[in-house]
Amino acid sequence: MSNKQNATLNITGMTCAACSNRIEKRLNKMDNVKAQVNLTTEKATIEYDTNDYAINDFVTTVQKLGYDVVIDKAELDITGMTCAACSNRIEKVLNKAPGVKDATVNLTTEQAMVTYYPGQTDLDTLIGRIRNLGYDAQPKQSEEDQATRKQQELKHKRNKLMISTILSLPLLMTMLVHLFNMHLPDILMNPWFQFILATPIQFIIGWQFYVGAYKNLRNGGFNMDVLVALGTSAAYFYSIYEMIKWFSGATNMPHLYFETSAVLITLILFGKYLEARAKSQTTNALSELLNLQAKEARLIDDNGMEKMVPLNQVNVDDILLIKPGEKIPVDGQIIKGETAIDESMLTGESMPVDKHVDDVVIGSTMNTNGVITIMATKVGKDTALSNIIKVVEEAQSSKAPIQRLADIISGYFVPIVIAIALLTFLIWITLVHPGQFEDALVAAISVLVIACPCALGLATPTSIMVGTGRAAENGILFKGGEYVERTHQVDTVVFDKTGTLTHGKPEVTYFEGDKDTLTLVASAENNSEHPLATAIVNYAKQHKVNLVNVTNYQTLPGHGIQAIIDDSMLFVGNQKLMLDHQINIQSIKQKMKQMEAEGHTVMLIAYDGKLRGMIAVADTVKASAKEAIQQLSSMNIRTVMLTGDNERTAKAIAKEVGIDQVIAGVLPEDKAHHITQLQEQKHNVAMVGDGINDAPALVKADIGIAMGTGTEVAIEAADITILGGDIQLVPKAIHASHKTIRNIKQNLFWAFGYNIAGIPIAAMGLLAPWIAGAAMALSSVSVVSNALRLKRMKL
């Protein structure tokens, strides 16, 4: 049966009619597809049969031609979800909606992340689909508004719990009569008194369960509300039946279960309240990041006057004044003044960093001592901190593959539990205690209320939220839950050398000669822009050397440099340069070879026809590199260096830090090939690089880890970003993934084990309904509480 549908795609990258014609021709070659591409509106209108194609098929076709399709991303706040069945149902409906590329719904954060094609659908349509299911949705609020809303919800839950507890306590005491054979005042045993207390709990305080159950059943779904409504209603209405019999003249005191329905609702509300409180703590890491942001800025207007303005009023190119002790409000560039900036909130480096004119400063870092004027370069959502917050938010809202089993089971969970409860009732009334309706009913109610789909739904996302949040506090940004799980499987870590294991810039590592010799070399090298020359000049400045005038400076390609100082010739360069000018180097030759064998670039110094000394320069290894490699080795993880540098230098550095294998002389475009070779050997590979030159290898690896700084967070290039470039965070990231996945497995074991053991025990009549309800209420609390242990995770 044909199912025709029209789709509209917004296409980018078209520059002329040839582009639009090419796309249109290619789309129309697809079977049973009619397409028109409009260059002016940059839209493609496509008529197709949904039995043959999905919208993503056309997107892929356009992208293969070298163009792209506009994709929007929406974040929605959802209210009314009570368990995993709710979040799974919403997710399925959104993913089936026309124009939706991908949707994930997180029960813990109560949010949906939807990527969609704007020509096909829009935000209002997506919200409408969620509301049709019986839930409420709205565009994501600001963190402040969300916090206020959740505080109000928590207060509302607490108030309902308090009222329910007050009404339930007298009924709970009637349970104690049966358990401990206690004597209670007659009024507590009076059916009318129990009815008056239980009814508002059932139909006012517990009305939310009926509403939730109705909305789900109306849309063909089942969730926790259905179980609670069925279980408590069975107990309540059976008690009404017994009351009517007694009121009609029955001589025996009725067997009432008002206390069962009332106490069940109270216990479930108690569990939900504890769960909400615990879940609010899972977002602490994100809240702390948000609190780092400055609230206002000191703007210098066109007249040179200062005025304080809210942060959202600062624009790019605005001039801002920052005084000592104030936060840098936005990313910018210093145009006046100098200071030291505490960047520890982004890089983890405790020592303030000196900043001068033209240096870049990062929003939300702290100005420690000087008065500076900056020009804003990035504001709002473009700042480094905003990008970090975005990564953490997306990671905390994402799903890990390990969650799939729980999602599948929770989709069928409630109908299966209802079937088991019905079967339990039939077995009890026909086989266990034939004709004993009450015993059968109690066993069935226990089955209904002990089953807990909530624990299944919370097991993975709460651990992901807390684990990624804790990692972010330590400068480790996971892109999503999927990458937490994949990092856990890594057995080989490949390192780029320059900028990853080393500082990425040459430094003087050895100097042999007197201060006058250093003056000569630095004065000559001050005429060069070469990185080695810069390293020598910086070294001289550190040793308080005063430079002198140089004439006839000349670069000698492949050899070094020459210059005239005080009418005498200076040569700085390699062994061949010295030999060409008959300079005797025997006294220094052995030391030179030793330094070169260790990967240093050695330059000999001759002045006025005589050897004056030697200076060696190298890209020095980071202090933490050796310890990082040792930590990886202790975790039984193989380490590899992949570099474009020469083999001698690479092996020297590898030996210094303890790396297992060296692959040297590799061009950037060939690095991905070597990653593939390791993967073909059945290794799960993580690639650690700078996120720019190593982009192909980062993408090819099972896990790409980018070493970023506050201004160069390579978020798009890698699955994990290490802030500040501290290589010790690489083993810590892997350790964090191990801890988080272990926590998830503990949660899933508890969630599955609880239901697998609890339901049969309840079916055998070994648990009173109120005990079963208490167990259900506390099961999800225990899962969230276990996840919160990750907040204390040591990295």
Curated annotation (Swiss-Prot):
Subcellular location: Cell membrane
Residues the entry annotates as binding Cu(+) 2: C83, C86
Keywords assigned: ATP-binding, Cell membrane, Copper, Copper transport, Ion transport, Magnesium, Membrane, Metal-binding, Nucleotide-binding, Phosphoprotein, Repeat, Translocase, Transmembrane, Transmembrane helix, Transport
Species: Staphylococcus haemolyticus (strain JCSC1435)
Purpose: Involved in copper export.
Positions with a binding annotation for Cu(+) 1: C16, C19
Pfam families hit by this protein: E1-E2_ATPase, HMA, Hydrolase
Name this polypeptide is given: Copper-exporting P-type ATPase
Single GO MF annotation: ATP binding
UniProt KW Chaperone keyword: no
NCBIfam families with a match to the protein in the record: ATPase-IB1_Cu, ATPase-IB_hvy, ATPase_P-type, copper ion binding protein
Phylogenetic classification of the source organism: Bacteria, Bacillati, Bacillota, Bacilli, Bacillales
